[in-house]
Amino acid sequence: MENKRNFFITIALSILILALWQVFYLGPKTEAQREQARIEEQQRQAQQAAQNRQASSSTGDTPQMPANPDSIPGQGDTKAAGAPLTRDAAIAQSPRIEIDTPSLRGSINLTGARLDDLYLKKYHETVSDKSPEIELLAPSSLKQGYFVELGFTGNDATGAVPGPNTVWVVEGNNKLTPSTPVTLTYTNDKNLTFKRVISVDDAYMFTVDDTIINNGGSTVSLASYGRVTRFNQPEHASATYVLHEGLIGVMGQDGLQEIKYAKIKDNKDISFKDVIGGWVGITDKYWAATLIPPQDEKFTGRFSHFTNDRPRYQSDLLSAPLTVAPGQSQKIQNRVFAGAKVVNTIQNYETKYHIKQFDLLIDWGWFYFITKPMFYLIDWIYKFTGNFGVAILVVTVLLKALFFPLANKSYKSMARMKLMQPKMTEIREKYADDKMKQQQAMMELYKREKINPLAGCWPVLVQIPVFFALYKVLYVTIEMRHAPFFGWIQDLAAPDPTSIFNLFGLLPYTVPHFLMIGVWPIIMGITMFLQMRMNPTPPDPTQAAIFTWMPIIFTFMLASFPAGLVIYWAWNNTLSIIQQSVIMKRQGVKIELFDNLKGLFRRKPKEANK
């Protein structure tokens, strides 16, 4: 019975790891390749920009604004990018306001008051601080154009209201910093004056205060709209199923909406009307751009896909109509989040501005009730250790302590089973020809000795959701991105960069990706091998072969996992070996580890010739 239990545990673990390998290895591998291609393309564009900063081309944005203010904005940019432009050339096409904060740098395009030029100062493409800063938003005339825009929709009575082609006028300060907001104005032919004050904090939140002043002779009705628009699907978006990348939003009572790029291609348009409380945007793994309307007022939210001359993905919202009588004014405030999805920053924004479920901008996954607390625990310990890798080691010890009663009961049951081995062998020999009686006798023995043959499964089953949760923390939280451990591990969220097949860098050649078996995966495999050798070798040859090969298979499969996860697994195995040794010793059971290791190198005696 014990051998069957071990066999089933082995098969279950093998299936689990095969599934994990399919999801976590193939996806991140493709993502890494595409990310490298994207970095190389950006570097090529930067070099081209340095050679030709005077290049320019007209790429006007001409959305079709609806006549009915109750309608969501139309398709928007319908013109193709035209001749390829460098980023510098695209930015030089329009007058701009500089953005300079501790976290951001870039500019606001005065044509449309569009936020389409934004870099994240604190984050780089690679672990090197000398590598390029992360480019979040880009002008629409570029192939990967990505921007945020706020405007108005009106009718004949309102005249031309601010839209994507409106050129705003700057009043006073022309540099946006946390201490210096900027003011933009626009007056149309109906004597409607629009005054926009844009402010920004030290992190990633822009506040846009719009005032509409009616100096005309008739009452007007108009609505405020906002849109987050991205041209072309990012290369990394379909790399993995582990997290959501694409259009996202919270739509009041309808809750979180996650729309993959492929899904919106099929549906074209997904709308939510009369929403109170929520937000819309587009999210990547670590970064996002979102629009946040007043949380106590109705709005219409929409996710769209347009083809036209090039694919365009859009999350937008439309406010309820605003009525402005002659001589009166109306105000509306919207916010724009554009930056890194730092957990505490997102949580603080949700609390400060009462943004409905803004924390769901971070994809915590199915085990969010484990993943989120685990992140906060790791982050809290990090404040004392100053190293996320050490924090993971400490959390592993705490988890071992938390599940000690379960593990203790399991190991005690396993120890008693070892003590019962002589009786179990006797039963097998006695009923060798009658499997039914053999099983009945075994069950009676288990019941009499209070042994649970499946007790060893529980520590494994408990570890599975913890494994997934820790993987999710390492994979989606930006705090773990480029977080170093010690020595050669400079990014806990990336695989171990070394490989035994080039002697860990001593031999001057690049190893194929599937042979990148680093130091930590090897350490993990050794600890797994030792843990399995704590128990006697199964008498069945098939089971014995599986137990022998499992550590090797796990070593290859986990080599592509984040280094932080492999370190956790190796450390967890080490603690399990220590824990099991102590419990077995207390139960008076012989520890088989050294005998089993010696048995591997002991020559089997040859059968005597008859």
Swiss-Prot record:
Membrane topology: Multi-pass membrane protein
GO CC terms of this entry: plasma membrane
Annotated spans, Disordered: 36-82
Pfam (any one): YidC_periplas
Cell compartments where the protein resides: Cell inner membrane
Main location: membrane
Single Gene Ontology MF annotation: membrane insertase activity
CDD domains hit by this protein: 5TM_YidC_Alb3, EcYidC-like_peri
Keywords: Cell inner membrane, Cell membrane, Chaperone, Membrane, Protein transport, Transmembrane, Transmembrane helix, Transport
Gene Ontology biological-process entries: protein insertion into membrane; protein transport
Coiled-coil region: none
Disulfide bond annotation, renumbered to this chain: none
Segments passing through the bilayer: 7-27, 358-378, 387-407, 458-478, 510-530, 546-566
Biased composition (Low complexity): 44-55
InterPro entries the UniProt entry points to: Membr_insert_YidC, Membr_insert_YidC_N, YidC/ALB3/OXA1/COX18, YidC/Oxa/ALB_C, YidC_ALB_C, YidC_periplasmic_sf
Quaternary structure (record): Interacts with the Sec translocase complex via SecD. Specifically interacts with transmembrane segments of nascent integral membrane proteins during membrane integration.
Family: Belongs to the OXA1/ALB3/YidC family. Type 1 subfamily.
Function, as annotated: Required for the insertion and/or proper folding and/or complex formation of integral membrane proteins into the membrane. Involved in integration of membrane proteins that insert both dependently and independently of the Sec translocase complex, as well as at least some lipoproteins. Aids folding of multispanning membrane proteins.
Listed name of the protein: Membrane protein insertase YidC
Taxonomic source organism: Brucella suis biovar 1 (strain 1330)
Source organism phylogeny: Bacteria, Pseudomonadati, Pseudomonadota, Alphaproteobacteria, Hyphomicrobiales
Gene that encodes it: yidC
